[in-house]
């Protein structure tokens, strides 16, 4: 097995929205804001090469939305999903599977593209995997709070392509088609899936939006986007405590400075020990 960190380009979101009720003087110590109060965010994905499988976890924002849409998020950097794959010697047709942690636009937008008048999958040979409960949450009757993040042009073409697999998601377990252990959490959104990967004697948890940046490690530091913030607090407390006890590394999706973080227990609770690149985490 090999793991690769896939950069898809940075974007910005309002710092207040990203930290909810946490006062700015506290959160800007780790996530400095620009003149519009926005903080820098990565849209990092994880690529898992395992035998004849090439599994992509999430797909970034993509590029098919309008200039007006992207103007709200101040995208930056030269990285893109396809360029990052190409730099590793892969092309879109090599991807065998795509696992979505959830279906907010910054996690799944890069899985489809415009092709003439149609929107089609970028990865022609891949199966796309999503929790059945989360898919229904996002497509059948999306709630007013999340509707703007569930862009149907990102979602329905996947179903129409015949490449979508909806897995049963009532509890934590294994996605049998991929052989990945999944933690299912419900604070940020319904049935967000956090894959756990054992690699070179260590365990990595893809933190997704449970812990979007290292600045969000303290349990009360929650995003204003979470639909069930008290549930998020319970989930973070339990999962981060377990991560410390089991020496689990967190793969950071939205932290522009750290790909991997190591946690430690302190008198104030679980905190950041150190951050590093994926490569550094596995250097002997």
Show the residue positions of the predicted features:
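Active-site beta-strand termini and strand-to-loop segments that position acidic
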Residues: 48-51, 195-200
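Metal-dependent catalytic neighborhoods of phosphoester/phosphodiester hydrolases
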Residues: 108-118, 262-263
